[in-house]
Amino acid sequence: MEEFQRYLELDRSRQHDFLYPLLFREYIYALAHDHGLNKSILSENAGYGNKSSSIIVKRLITRMYQQNPLIFSANDSIQNQFFGHNKNLYSQIISEGFAVIVEIPFSLRLVSFLERKEIAKSQNLQSIHSIFPFLEDKFSHLDYVSXVLIPYHIHLEILVQTLRYWVKDASSLHLLRFFLHEYWNTLITPKKYITLFSKGNPRLFLFLYNSHICEYESIFLFLRNKSSHLRSTSSGIFFERIYFYVKIKHFVKVFFDNDFQCILWFFKDPFMHYVKYQGKSILASKXTPLLMNKWKYYLVNLWQYHFYAWFQPGRININQLCXYSLDFLGYRSSVRLNSSVVXXQMLKNLFLINNAMKXFETIVPIIPLIGSLSKANFCNTLGHPISKPTRSDSSDSDIINRFLRICRNLSHYHSGSSKKKSLYRVKYILRLSCVKTLARKHKITIRTFLKKSGSEFLEKFLTEEEVVLSLIFPRTYSTSRRLYXZQSWYLDITSINDLVNYE
């Protein structure tokens, strides 16, 4: 690990030239093991200790360059037992090593960027909930919104060409290109495109996808800055690109035969907000739908002519924000008009003034969440709680703690909901499912189990916030109504709950 850190501190001119030899360094695969693999796949095979993993990688790369990588000599009986039956396994070994190596230039640029801009490292910026305060602040003033599915069926050569701007090591790029064409179907099958963000996908391909999105967003932000009256503020990292302006100028001239700056000035846009999440993006704008249509065809032409990805304009729908709901990150968000009546009196005349204000509202979509609970065997498809099968040696405390952990995690994640009715229903399903599971284990009725457990069992399912507030405030109608509409966004949530990740 220390050797890896020393390598990161080398001069930038040397960093690009010596990535290929890192494939044969032991600590690279130890680092990949710590971040990616669940087990030490190299040490589990007989005859291979930790010190021989670099030898294994050398043989893997040699066989990969051969016409048939699974043809071995008669003296390689032990190796044949390892390689011949584990093609997926050793392709994963190399992919994990590749992932660590190609991330080095990105990590170095990120560190230098943060140091140059004097940006303090903050874990709060990584929270999923940090996006919702931004939406509350901005979206209530906008008029039109469009949800766009970012295409990711990109040709392998496009992915390699994207990395050429970051990795200057020709040997590494050549080996990466050969590896992708050889083992693409082995590592990612067509069915896995649907669950691209699942935990089981190889780290290398998640990195390639993120670099592909970085390429797309760098061009998109460039066009956004050039076509806006205001300077845009972004939380992303914007790096210099080779011949970047020349590429953009050529890209625009494909559609327009005029001066580049004049074209962009014609499309000046006062308000345009962009949000990306889970392979999707949201575009929101103020004023007329003409601006949204302009950016719609900008994106379509960008994907088709720059990334050679077929993108249908009809799949991008432009909707009025006041009559449209956004489903993302486990929430259903919308902008609603809240009317309030204000009584004003002037001399002897009394006036009633009706004020309508836009408010950003977030609720928990109950139907998809019940579908996730049904798949996890907490309830049926109608939302009726059922007993969950458990191991015979599981204790009551283990079962209760498991249900409590799930319930509190969901409450913590959905704490920003403006209406808690759906969340209360989910808590009811989990609480009654826990009761039925324990009653089934002891072979008694639910009524008998609740009599034996008492009220202490139900109080365990209260979250810490509910317990504190119930002690501070009396149980009145106004207090319960206040708790029902209370919103809290936590900045320590860095991953989506498995039950929420139904998209």
Curated annotation (Swiss-Prot):
Keywords: Chloroplast, mRNA processing, Plastid, RNA-binding, tRNA processing
Chief subcellular location: plastid
Protein origin, superkingdom: Eukaryota
GO CC entries: chloroplast
GO molecular function, one term: RNA binding
Role summary: Usually encoded in the trnK tRNA gene intron. Probably assists in splicing its own and other chloroplast group II introns.
Family to which this protein belongs: Belongs to the intron maturase 2 family. MatK subfamily.
Annotated HAMAP family: MatK
Protein name: Maturase K
Organism: Backhousia subargentea
